[in-house]
Every structure is written in C-alpha cells, then in structure tokens.
Design a protein with these regions (language model features):
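C-terminal soluble interaction/assembly domains
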Residues: 229-234, 252, 257, 269-272
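Mixed-charge, low-complexity segments
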Residues: 228, 240-241, 261-264, 269-272
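Helix N-cap/beta->alpha junction signal
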Residues: 236-238
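Short active-site oxyanion
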Residues: 28-31, 109-111, 162, 231, ...
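Positively charged, proline/Ser/Thr-rich regional signature most characteristic
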Residues: 6-82, 155-228, 269, 275-278
C-alpha cells in the first residue's frame, strides 16, 4: 500500500501515457512535439510536429540556441503562451527530456508533459499513426530565460552554495577511462555518479522502455545520496543525459535542479578546469 504522504511532492502530471494522449490530442490547446532524430516522415502520432533537438543547442558557446529562433520554431508548430505541450521521442526519452528542459528553462514550467515510453509505447498499443505534416495556426509565444534553472562553468568554479554535482554519464566517462573526444577525462571534483539510464525500467515484451515508478526513483536517488535539500546540478557531455535526470528529479519533486549546460563538452576541454580521475 502506498502511503499518500509519499505522493504529495511527486509531479505525476509531468508524465502521461498513450491513453491520455489519445484522449486529449485533438484539443487545440494541446500541442504534440516529436523529438525523434529520425522516423517522423514515415509515421508519427497524428497532429504531432517535428522538432530538431540538435537545433536547441549553440555548440560553439556551449549554451542554448538563441531564444528568438526557438520562439519562431514553436510558434510555427502552433504553440501559444497558454498551451500544454506533450513531447515524445523513440522511447528512452533522452531527446524528449532535452526538449522538456529547454522549454522549462524558457519559462514554460509545468506546461510540458512527456509521453512515457515514447513513440514505441504509442505503437505497441496499436494507436493510429500518420505520415501527414499537420497544418497549424501560428501561435503567439512569450519566452523568458529562467536563470535559476541553469549553472555555468563560472558558477561552479566560484563554489555554488549548498549544491550537489551529479554526473549522469557512464561509469567509464566518470572514471576518466572513456575520454570520448575530450582533451581531459574524469569528472567535476566532488561530483556524485548516477547514470541517467538507471531511471529507466527494463524493456517490456513489446520492447517499450518506461521510467521506473516515482516512489522507486525517489528511494534510489535518496540511496545514492542525492539530497533534495541541496541545489542539484546534473551534467553529462552536452546536457542531454543531464536533462534526462533533470526531468526525473522534477518528476519526483526535487525543488531546485540547475543543470550545467556546458557540461563536459566545455569542462573537459577548457584550460582552466580541474578534474578528478579514478
């Protein structure tokens, strides 16, 4: 039996299933965004618009793409300021959670939901698929950056008060054994390691991967020493996996999560950064 007190600070409204999407997708105030890297043209949830998640990042400056460009893309998809946005990807939710985080960073907090299990969950239950690009009445959207939802390299170097650095990469990246394409290997000094994909359950018989239930996630993050009283700073290589953990922490009610947007792409290639290797 679940103690209802355990559920009070969970944000269950952020996660939806295919039946919820089916019920609400024709509502003009609900906008579906397909964040998959490929496959949209072959078939997608009817009414969904494709978003290029790579375009959400300005790689040269290790930060978000310009707000005006994002606003134009979203308005073309029919997003207006009061809309509810439902995001999905193929199923592991790395791309969908990246989109979720960027939308929340730009002021749409609590207006974005994520389809648990993504497109795989939708097709597994035999829901309708469309190859049509939907028409959309252009939206009118106000976006404002929320500085308390991100940290910079300089913030970390200055010493963030009451913070906890959370490395969401693989164990080999954390240890410094896998450098990928970076000049330095290792992790931010003092960072705790908890890999992003530990938040996902095993694939079901249809191959659908969903998030573990919220109470399990809450317990596992607590057991890993991720204290909700602190400012949690997830990071990875480019803040896709870090954004996945941002979403999970939002789901289970952590109040102060500020990903390091530059992540290892910046930290692992700058001259003036300290690293810890195992």
């Amino acid at each position: 039996v679940t103690d209802s007190r355990d559920l009070n600070d969970l944000n269950a409204h952020l996660l939806v299933d295919p039946s919820w999407v089916e019920k609400h997708r024709r509502n003009p105030d609900i906008i579906l965004l397909d964040a998959r890297a490929k496959g949209y043209a072959a078939g997608h949830i009817p009414g969904a618009h494709w978003i290029d998640v790579k375009a959400l990042k300005d790689n040269t400056s290790h930060t978000f793409a310009a707000v005006d460009a994002l606003r134009a893309v979203l308005e073309k998809c029919g997003v207006s300021s009061g809309a509810t946005i439902v995001v999905y990807d193929e199923g592991n939710s790395v791309l969908a959670t990246r989109l979720f985080y960027v939308l929340e960073y730009y002021g749409l907090r609590d207006q974005v939901k994520l389809l648990n299990g993504g497109f795989a969950a939708w097709t597994a239950v035999g829901k309708e698929v469309s190859a049509e690009v939907p028409d959309a009445e252009e939206g009118t959207l106000a976006l404002f950056a929320e500085p308390l939802l991100v940290v910079t390299k300089e913030d970390i170097q200055a010493g963030l008060k009451d913070s906890l650095l959370l490395d969401t990469r693989s164990a080999l990246e954390y240890a410094g054994a896998d450098l990928r394409s970076n000049r330095k290997g290792g992790h931010l000094p003092g960072a705790i390691h908890k890999e992003w994909k530990e938040a996902l359950g095993a694939a079901d018989t249809d191959g659908v991967v969903r998030f573990k239930d919220a109470l399990t996630l809450k317990r596992e993050f607590a057991d890993a020493g991720i204290n909700p009283a602190k400012t949690i700073v997830p990071y990875c290589q480019s803040n896709q996996r870090g954004a996945h953990t941002y979403f999970v922490l939002r789901l289970i009610g952590y109040p102060d999560i500020r990903p390091y947007e530059g992540s290892w792409e910046e930290w692992g290639n700058d001259e003036d950064t300290e690293v810890t290797r195992l």
